[in-house]
Amino acid sequence: VFINVKCTGSKQCLPACKAAVGKAAGKCMNGKCKCYT
């Protein structure tokens, strides 16, 4: 699941993913966060 959060590194996506999908799992792809559900 891509969320509308800009990133430069995967670490930035973990708290954003936790807030968005309830799971702190994801990575930074093409400057945007991708979360795993």
UniProtKB/Swiss-Prot annotation:
Aromatic residue of the functional dyad, annotated site positions: Y36
Listed InterPro entries: Scorpion_toxin-like_sf (IPR036574), Scorpion_toxinS_K_inh (IPR001947)
Location in the cell: Secreted
Interaction with Ca(2+)-activated K(+) channels: region residues: 26-33
Keywords for the protein's UniProt record, in alphabetical order: Disulfide bond, Ion channel impairing toxin, Neurotoxin, Potassium channel impairing toxin, Secreted, Toxin
GO CC annotation, single: extracellular region
Tissues expressing the protein: Expressed by the venom gland.
Disulfide bridge positions per record: C7-C28, C13-C33, C17-C35
Gene Ontology molecular function terms on file: ion channel inhibitor activity; potassium channel regulator activity; toxin activity
Site (Basic residue of the functional dyad): K27
Domain of life of the organism encoding this protein: Eukaryota
Chief subcellular location: secreted
Gene3D superfamilies per UniProt: Knottin, scorpion toxin-like (3.30.30.10)
Stored Pfam families: Toxin_2 (PF00451)
Transmembrane feature ranges: none
Domain notes: Has the structural arrangement of an alpha-helix connected to antiparallel beta-sheets by disulfide bonds (CS-alpha/beta).
Family classification: Belongs to the short scorpion toxin superfamily. Potassium channel inhibitor family. Alpha-KTx 04 subfamily.
Reported function: Blocks reversibly Shaker B potassium-channels.
Identification of the protein by name: Potassium channel toxin alpha-KTx 4.3
Organism from which the protein derives: Tityus discrepans
